[in-house]
Each structure stands twice: as structure tokens, then as C-alpha cells.
Amino acid sequence: MATTKSFLILIVMILATTSSTFASLEEMVTVLSIDGGGIKGIIPGTILEFLEGQLQKMDNNADARLADYFDVIGGTSTGGLLTSMITTPNENNRPFAAANEIVPFFFEHGPHIFNSSTGQFFGPKYDGKYLMQVLQENLGETRVHQALTEVAISSFDIKTNKPVIFTKSDLAKSPELDAKMYDICYSTAAAPTYFPPHYFTTNTINGDKYEFNLVDGAVATVADPALLSISVATRLAEKDPAFASIRSLNYKKMLLLSLGTGTTSEFDKTYTAEETAKWGAIQWMLVIQRMTDAASSYMTDYYLSTVFQAQNSQKNYLRVQENALTGTTTEMDDASEANMESLVQVGENLLKKPVSKDNPETYEEALKRFAKLLSDRKKLRANKASY
């Protein structure tokens, strides 16, 4: 009798724990963040293709798309382009691009985007005309409010000297942010020295014209927009009672997937103090942005890893990054077929690598684990909505 009673108590405890786990999963906010990096966007594109493929298998649904699973998708520069591709609706109100179409997009258009050199020593390296053309053709007249999930795409206004973040949740108070997606995409990709800044106008709540003079989002958020994406997710939660559990920035209630475009561990070893002691403005100008981006990306990852671990929720944060790029794969604008093939290989090889020295789990295993959480959460919400 005592054994039976103990067994029943154990069953009740298991059911209670399971129920609590699923309730917690149902309440979680899911965030996808994609770094900038020009043609190196092929690397996160390869990772996204793997993740979406796993979700399709788990849910037995070939039409499953990443926008169905993430509450917030954010990106800067090429990450902003990827964000638009997987959240902008087509005529059937589904994402106009599946994840497995991202890499082919780069192969088709990359050589043209990074081939229209202006030939001006004092001007941008590329004229940006083909980039704008392909964005208009693919994104059409779609605006921010039509995105299939919340987005967070950053840019920087060089006239007001302020960052500009395009999100759906800010449109009620700032309708001027409801810009066309192709204007936003070009702006977040308009890296100084590579592409010209972008000027366009929208309308304010009073119907007045509002001007934008924008450059690359990395100027505003550096190359890693993960913190930006989290802040948007937190503000989104403040407005939605379903996400009440994360209003105090409880990372236990957040799933964050952050995708990098690769760095090189050798970069910091390239120069010595003795060598750079005699450098002037021109020499520093050629490398300082890369140094700043690499350092800031590292610090963002370090901060997020620390705060997630402090709340005993380190499994809720996954940073997918290749830290050992070499040769032409380090370049933002080498769109030669050979280099793009190498970038695909980098992404595929990355899946087999361990997440860190302290975590033997491979990126492939970690992404499968993330996919399972995303799939289960979607099913739980669908079941709740059906009642």
C-alpha cells in the first residue's frame, strides 16, 4: 500500500513538473538576431536553412517558415536583408523567401551588387543601383506593418545623428516608421565607403512629410543586433498579457538565437604596438571599423552569456559564430563564386563544431534542441488558441 501511495505521489510530481515546464515554454518569447557582414550573410543563411529544415521535419509541414516560430526577428546590414526576406509576405501572405532560398539569392545577385564600382577614389566603392533594383523587385510596395512577425531592423540617420529602429510595435506612436521594406533594407545595408547613404520620405501622424537620411545599421547597433532584438522583445512583452512573465527581463522566459557572419581569431594578432605606433589617420581608418565590430560583437556575446547564465538559463541563448575565418572569406564584398562556395562550406562545417570549449554540444545538436523547443511552443500555443 505504501509503495502504491509513493508511486502515485511520484506520478503526480512528474505530471506537475511536466505541466510547469510546458506552461513555461508556452509563455516564452522567441527571438532571432542576425548579424551584418555583407556577402558573409551566406553563413547565417546556411544556418537558417538547416534550422527551418528541422522545423519542417518535426512538424511534418513543408510550408513551415521561421516567421511562424519567432516573436521577434532582428537584423542589421545583411542581417536586415535576411530579416526582410523571411518576414515580408508574398501574395499568399507567407514569407516571400524560404530559408533555403537565401543562399541562392546571394549567388544570383551578390556578384552584381558588389560589381557596380563607381570608380571614384573619394566616393563609395559601389553605386548601390543594382542593390536597390533587386530589393524593389523582390519586396515590392510592402511596408513594415505587413511583416509576418515583429521585426527590428536598425539604421542610422546622419542628419539627426540618431539611430532609427524599424519595428511594428512602434508604429502606433511613430507612423513615419512604416516605411517600405526596400527602403529599409537598402538603408541598413548602406555601409559607409561601400554604398551611398539613402534618402527617402514617409508621412507623420499629422500627414507631414518626414525625411530619412540613413546609413548602415551597424553604425547604430554595431554588427551584432542581439541586444536591440531583446529590447524590442521586452517592449513587445509589456504590451501583450501573454508575455507578462518576462516584463522584468526574466531571461528564463526568453529563447534567443543569435547568428554571426564570422570573424577571424587571427585579426587581433595581425598588428603589434611597435608596428602601429607610427600609424596616422589613414592607416587606422582602414582597420579600426573591423576592430570595433569584432570587439563589440564579442562583448555583446559575453554580456548575454553572463546574464543568461546568472539566471541559470544558459540553454536559452545560442550564439552561432565562426571565429576562425581566413583568406577571402573575411571580406564583406568578395562575391566571386569561389569565395561564396567557401562561405557555404564555412556554414556547413560550423554545424559540426562544438558550441564552445566548455560545451561539447555541436551547433547542429544545439540547433536541433532549439528547433524542438520552438516546435513544442508553437503546438502549445495552437492548442491553447483552439479552446
Swiss-Prot record:
InterPro entries reported in the protein's UniProt record: Acyl_Trfase/lysoPLipase (IPR016035), PNPLA_dom (IPR002641)
GO process annotations (BP): defense response; lipid catabolic process
N-terminal signal peptide: 1-23
Domain PNPLA: 32-230
Motif (GXGXXG): 36-41
Glycosylation: residue positions: 115
Top EC group: hydrolase
EC number: 3.1.1.-
Compartment annotation: Vacuole
Motif (GXSXG): 75-79
GO cellular component term of the entry, any: vacuole
Motif position, DGA/G: 216-218
GO MF, one example: phospholipase activity
Positions in coiled-coil regions: 361-385
Tissues of expression: Tuber.
Main location (coarse class): other
Similarity-based family: Belongs to the patatin family.
Record comment regarding domains: The nitrogen atoms of the two glycine residues in the GGXR motif define the oxyanion hole, and stabilize the oxyanion that forms during the nucleophilic attack by the catalytic serine during substrate cleavage.
Primary role: Probable lipolytic acyl hydrolase (LAH), an activity which is thought to be involved in the response of tubers to pathogens.
Other observations noted: Patatin have a dual role as a somatic storage protein and as an enzyme involved in host resistance.
Name of the protein in its database record: Patatin group D-2
Organism whose genome encodes this protein: Solanum tuberosum
